[in-house]
From Swiss-Prot:
Job of this protein: F(1)F(0) ATP synthase produces ATP from ADP in the presence of a proton or sodium gradient. F-type ATPases consist of two structural domains, F(1) containing the extramembraneous catalytic core and F(0) containing the membrane proton channel, linked together by a central stalk and a peripheral stalk. During catalysis, ATP synthesis in the catalytic domain of F(1) is coupled via a rotary mechanism of the central stalk subunits to proton translocation.
Protein name (Swiss-Prot/TrEMBL): ATP synthase subunit c
SUPFAM superfamilies: F1F0 ATP synthase subunit C
Annotated site, Reversibly protonated during proton transport, chain positions: 56
Topology term for the membrane: Multi-pass membrane protein
Organism, scientific name: Bacillus caldotenax
GO cellular component, one term: plasma membrane
Taxonomic placement: Bacteria, Bacillati, Bacillota, Bacilli, Bacillales
Gene (name only): atpE
Record-linked Pfam families: ATP-synt_C
Residues of the signal peptide: none
Subcellular location: Cell membrane
Assembly, per entry: F-type ATPases have 2 components, F(1) - the catalytic core - and F(0) - the membrane proton channel. F(1) has five subunits: alpha(3), beta(3), gamma(1), delta(1), epsilon(1). F(0) has three main subunits: a(1), b(2) and c(10-14). The alpha and beta chains form an alternating ring which encloses part of the gamma chain. F(1) is attached to F(0) by a central stalk formed by the gamma and epsilon chains, while a peripheral stalk is formed by the delta and b chains.
Length: 72
């Protein structure tokens, strides 16, 4: 097994781990905010979805970069 494959696997794994932790924090804080102020639910949900999308973009970029690196 080459070192490049190991590096790509670590990059993808750490990216997924970070995204999972980030998504959990975003959703938990959104639920706390909705419980505290239910009238702000639409605004908080919209902000949550934007935040989750941004957090999920990073692991996808990591996968793309690892494929590019392995293609060399």
């Amino acid at each position: 097994m080459s070192l490049g494959v190991l590096a790509a696997a670590i990059a993808v794994g750490l990216g997924a781990l970070g995204a999972g932790i980030g998504n959990g924090l975003i959703v938990s804080r959104t639920i706390e905010g909705i419980a505290a102020q239910p009238e702000l639910r639409p605004v908080l949900q919209t902000t949550m979805f934007i935040g989750v999308a941004l957090v999920e973009a990073l692991p996808i970029i990591g996968v793309v970069f690892s494929f590019i690196y392995l293609g060399r």
